[in-house]
């Protein structure tokens, strides 16, 4: 299962960002090109194993856009994107967030109180972005049916679980200067 994703992750190039080994992958970075077969495999898996009884799919720019698009096209469920730009539309939700890698503001439009959503993201490391996003959505009165993240790296899933936020990952990885390794399925996050 998810063989295209796993194979592509194992082949992902590693670059250094300071002391941090960073993997580059089409699903998490948009480069090199995103293979439609990869998106097809991922979206099929998400549709099969997620609670799809939702009003909306919600994902985070930029790399959440192709994921949400693929799922939306297959299910007919509309999607909204959490943006880094403010639009000042009525009902816009502003989130101030700080993670291990960045800080700033995010904006959600097209989500209303009482909506039931599927939240999809490309990668989780520290869990910071999802933590702030989930809190903002819950305060708005939105129900989150599932939180699905394609690639799990680091301890973000465990940190969020300790706060009562359940995140499902498709693949958990370890990244070193030698490359990406796929961690065995523990059943805890998948």
UniProtKB/Swiss-Prot annotation:
Record carries keyword Glycosyltransferase: yes
EC number(s) reported in the record: 2.4.2.8
Coiled coil region boundaries: none
Places the protein is found: Cytoplasm
Superkingdom of this protein's organism: Archaea
Annotated InterPro entries: HGPRTase-like (IPR026597), PRibTrfase_dom (IPR000836), PRTase-like (IPR029057), Pur/Pyrimidine_PRTase (IPR050118)
PANTHER family: HYPOXANTHINE/GUANINE PHOSPHORIBOSYLTRANSFERASE, XANTHINE PHOSPHORIBOSYLTRANSFERASE
Subunit structure: Homodimer.
Family per similarity comment: Belongs to the purine/pyrimidine phosphoribosyltransferase family. Archaeal HPRT subfamily.
Function noted in UniProt: Catalyzes a salvage reaction resulting in the formation of IMP that is energically less costly than de novo synthesis.
Name assigned to this protein: Hypoxanthine/guanine phosphoribosyltransferase
Biological classification of the source: Archaea, Methanobacteriati, Methanobacteriota, Stenosarchaea group, Methanomicrobia
């Amino acid at each position: 299962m998810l063989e295209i994703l796993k194979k592509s992750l194992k082949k992902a190039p590693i670059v250094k960002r300071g002391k941090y080994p960073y993997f580059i992958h089409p699903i998490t970075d948009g480069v090199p090109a995103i293979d439609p077969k990869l998106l097809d495999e991922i979206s099929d898996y998400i549709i099969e194993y997620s609670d799809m009884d939702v009003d909306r799919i919600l994902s985070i720019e930029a790399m959440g856009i192709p994921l949400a698009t693929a799922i939306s096209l297959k299910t007919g469920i509309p999607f909204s994107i959490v943006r880094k730009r403010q639009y000042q539309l009525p009902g816009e939700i502003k989130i101030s967030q700080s993670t291990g890698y960045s800080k700033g503001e995010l904006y959600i439009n097209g989500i209303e109180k009482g909506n039931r959503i599927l939240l999809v993201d490309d990668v989780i490391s520290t869990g910071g972005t999802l933590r702030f996003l989930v809190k903002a959505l819950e305060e708005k009165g939105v129900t989150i049916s599932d939180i699905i993240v394609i690639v799990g790296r680091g301890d973000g899933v465990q940190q969020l679980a300790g706060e009562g936020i359940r995140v499902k990952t498709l693949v958990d990885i370890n990244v070193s200067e030698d490359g990406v390794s796929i961690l065995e399925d523990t059943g805890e996050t998948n």
